Design a protein with these regions (language model features):
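Long extracytoplasmic/lumenal interhelical loops at the membrane interface
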Residues: 2-14, 18-59
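Domain-wide signal for the mature, well-folded portions of proteins, strongly enriched
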Residues: 9, 29, 48, 52-53, ...
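Short glycine-rich loop/turn motifs that provide flexible caps or phosphate-binding loops at active sites
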Residues: 18-20, 59-62, 113, 121
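Short, flexible micro-motifs
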Residues: 22-26, 63-66, 109, 117, ...
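Hydrophobic transmembrane alpha-helices and their immediate junctions
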Residues: 35, 58-99
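Transmembrane alpha-helices of multi-pass inner-membrane enzymes
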Residues: 91-103, 107-134
Length: 134
């Protein structure tokens, strides 16, 4: 994924504040000669294959910062609520695993990966609120 990440970072540097637009990665990669030439070993991908790089490339700094604030607010909610400590720890470990920053991922925007991710995130929030053992 090295070529994809380098291309993504170049796209971000060209549009740092607002990004290239949501779901525009593949379109811009295929239709911009400079970007297409950066993909030597692979064809243009549909997305950058990392959720943080995707938000940075497609949404710019604004969207990446909002996404990180969103994740921290969920983690803060789980830590502060009065649920069972064991379930809170399980929820936090699951979230940390799902949103590990250096992991290759699917797109959160346009495929099943996003549906599953946000479903599991909701389950983790609910699980962390249980006060007694199940």
């Amino acid at each position: 994924y090295g070529e994809i990440y380098v291309l993504s970072f170049k796209m971000f540097l060209d549009n740092p504040i607002t990004g290239i637009g949501i779901n525009n990665f593949k379109y811009l990669c295929n239709n911009n000669k400079q970007y297409k030439n950066m993909m030597v070993n692979y064809n243009c991908a549909s997305h950058p294959h990392n959720i943080y790089i995707q938000w940075l490339t497609e949404g710019g700094l604004i969207v990446l910062i909002l996404f990180i604030i969103y994740l921290f607010s969920i983690v803060g909610f789980i830590i502060k609520n009065e649920g069972n400590k064991k379930y809170k720890i399980i929820s936090l470990v699951i979230i940390l695993t799902m949103f590990w920053p250096i992991m290759s991922t699917g797109s959160l925007i346009k495929n099943w990966y996003g549906i599953i991710t946000f479903f599991i995130l909701g389950i983790c929030v609910c699980l962390s609120r249980f006060k007694n053992n199940l």
